[in-house]
Amino acid sequence: MYATRDQERCKKMLVRAARRAAVTARRATSTVGDNRVVRLQTEDPRMSKIVIHNGVVYTSGQTAGDAGDCVKAQTQATLAKVDALLKEAGTSKSHALSATIWLKDINRDFTAMNEVWNDWVDPDNKPVRATVEAAMARPVLLVEIQVTAALDKNPFEDLNY
């Protein structure tokens, strides 16, 4: 009975380690001393969309792309992208530490953007936040959002290398 339980536990540990190793192998990783820096979604020649360091996930600024000319729709689409990035990094909005929001027209769009934000944010784990008006990279963009979050746990703690 104990051998079976131990074998099953060992098998699960090996499967988890293999999965993590496969994920880690496809990430661009650099090491400085004992501090690992993991970069995900590095296809863009200018930036990574996700950087993980010391248990903190940094996302690049996200925009809605072609979500129309309504700030609510753009905010919803942008936050969906943020959710996807956080999930890929191994965390979620409930671990968000800070958010920066840029609006093309803060006087016109602040209230509507906040309605969507309030529906999205975890009410028990609200991050610090700043919202400012900014010239956007493309005329169609009304909102851009960048989120920094804590990891659920250290992704390297179970790996032996």
What is each model feature region?
Residues 4-6, 10-97, 103-161:
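N-terminal presequence-like segments and the immediate start of the first folded domain
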